[in-house]
Amino acid sequence: MSKVMSSNLGYPRIGEDREWKKVLEKYWSNKVDEETFQKQMEVIRLAHVKKQRDQGVDLIPLGDFSLYDHVLDTAVMFGGVPERFDYQGGKVPLDTYFDIARGTKDSPASEMTKWFNTNYHYIVPEFSGSEPKLVENRPLAFYREAKEKLGIKGEPVIIGPFTFVKLSKGYDDGDGNALVEKLVPLYARVLKELQEEGVEWVQMDEPILCTSISRQEVE
């Protein structure tokens, strides 16, 4: 007899006592170094996973947690750093990640706008002519973390390519589909590496499909 399985689209990152916000502000004010910051965020992240496990959730989302913004996470995973920030390739450094979100004295932050019709604001990715490339398989990293630290085989979460492009800027209206086509092989690589790791379920979010899109985009 088949079993009905429970899942969860995502878990609030803020924490019961706003732990996430407090750790973030400590790092921004130079009260903790990067290593301490990452360890403290890991504690919060794994506590959220453990709580869902203890409540009987079968397919626990992994990768929904973010150090700042999940759309920005997707952008940096594909090397999406605006040209005004001194990015030299490879995995995007933490300080560069936050520079995109907050800006520096010489480089303005990326735009923020509402996530659909909610009060949540995300960092708008910018396509500035550089080719997207996979520089870090973040869903795989979160899957391994939960498996190694908690023995949990969860469900990696990632924003789908169509939604990611539609929420971005820096390209002409007619170039959106071409950008999606460039991203598809990179997403395929992410999924292949997850499959090789033994991942059985992946949650790919495409909320843009719930909005009004053109026939051309559908095709």
What are these regions (language model features)?
Residues 1-219:
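Domain-level signal for soluble alpha/beta catalytic cores
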